[in-house]
Amino acid sequence: ISVTGGTESTKYLVSGNFFKQNGVVKNNDMERYTGRINLEQKVSKYVNLGVNMTLSRNQTNNVPLGSGQNENASIMVAAAQFNPLLPIKDENGDYTLNSQAAFLPNPVSLLEITDKTMKERLLATAFVEVKPIQDLTLKANFGIDRNYQKRSVYMPKTTLYGQKKGGQADIAQYD
């Protein structure tokens, strides 16, 4: 969605967008929000000011989709290699492991892993344009590009990954 308009001395654009994509694997999706504002103001015959700003936020629910083997197997590799004749859980309610390949995770257990990534970015510029005399324009630009990312991962003890440590949680943050 966007709105544009203005007058002889003011021009503006405001826009926003939302996008959601579900993955082909259960519990895997992505949402993106973006917003943009452009504003230009003619202050006088000699001075123009302007601001352009874009803000985006991406949220992703990840599942193990890597190309590793054994305990690092992706959910697709684990599903392809796991014995389909075994029940999902044993009589104790624990995920069944293949006795001939105990290093291979039960693919259903991988769906219990919580792996969320959130990214935000602000990209902004501002300018001042001055025309002190005919045929001379002075323009100063100022800008910022700010990124933030946070990834939260939880592997419950019911998964092969978390079993070794009684469950594991990690948070990584970049600024």
Map each language-model feature to its residues:
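Surface-exposed loop/interface segments of Gram-negative outer-membrane beta-barrel transport/assembly proteins
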Residues: 1, 23-28, 34, 38-121, ...
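A generic beta-sheet turn/junction motif
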Residues: 5-9, 18
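Outer-membrane beta-barrel channels and translocator barrels
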Residues: 7-8, 44, 131-133
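An active-site-proximal structural segment forming one wall of the substrate-binding cleft
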Residues: 136
